[in-house]
């Protein structure tokens, strides 16, 4: 009881003294995002390829974010704020799911996504500038209908936003993401390493990635703005572990660089965004439906390069009819594919009968999604979403001393019809939304085409719960269900 009384006294003292400093009574605000529902999709599907095929009628999880924030103080023209956010994710339709990690197939996941502090109006000469520090979502760029954040370097960091420079605004940030490198990738998944396996010098790893980001936004003409952005990614390894496991300079993971040019154009009946992204170095894998933050820890992408093109938008053709769309093209190359080289880093094929070593030498992808919608009544509408994607990995393989080139390809198509209820059916952004949908899918089995490689025409898919079945080249499925989504 004594400890409780001391804590209460401290809280009371703080609450009494704070207004004296700032002459301001804090106000709290509550915000978030949520989606949940039910569908006939196979319950073991963890994370469908929404970036490739679109979110409508292709969601199989429960996901929510809850945020709390407040303006703690106001001094002259400055505002001092604190913001926080936690997220929840569940993949199975169980009534009771704990956060216990002992059973990875049934537990729910919680994550602390944001906790940061900011002050706006600190500079007398630039009242729009914001100084911030903490962990936060940082300038995420996304395509809504694909539920894909193609530029997302969120994490722990600090920075200054919206500095006035010429006709535009400049934002600078340093963000850090830590990585646990006690694992490696096999052909299909992440594998935790035992101590003796860590001596495998082909997986050197790193301890953290530091992102140095600069973004400049400025108007170019009527209803149009340009964004120029550059991110330099510095990979930092744990020196103790690096030396402990005998890694040397050739095992180092190189740094990466990303450049973006983006044009946002508004119209009286909608908007359109076109973006071009150039990737260089160890983060080039982000050119394949990535976020810009992933690093190839094998070191095979140290000399790689890639380009990604995006176009997406929303157009109202009539008062009741509109179309959203997204187009994506990517290509990358320059990977270390010298399977005969001393420093070569490759993968062992999962199929024991056709065991060999493979390496990526190139990659290309294309995606197109169209999302027309028609308002029926004030609070209902019909939505149709069609999408297509294809990906090809150019590879070099070595087996029994023989080197050969081959391609691995995966592709898919989706068509969804949905009846949607929302507060304002004329507004595509109106939430909450309840969607009754039916979806047809045609894709590679489990996202993998087993007809390529070293003649492995069939393979066995092993789910997280141990369930096994044979995989085939093509996969057709019809999914129906009801999902809700909201943000506030």
Region spans (language model):
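Outer-membrane beta-barrel transmembrane domain signature
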Residues: 121, 185-196, 376, 391-416, ...
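Transmembrane beta-barrel strands of outer-membrane/channel proteins
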Residues: 32-40, 82-88, 131-137, 172-176, ...
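Beta-barrel outer-membrane channel/assembly domains of diderm bacteria
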Residues: 2-4, 8-127, 131, 161-170, ...
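Detector for outer-membrane/organellar transmembrane beta-barrel domains
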Residues: 219-417, 421
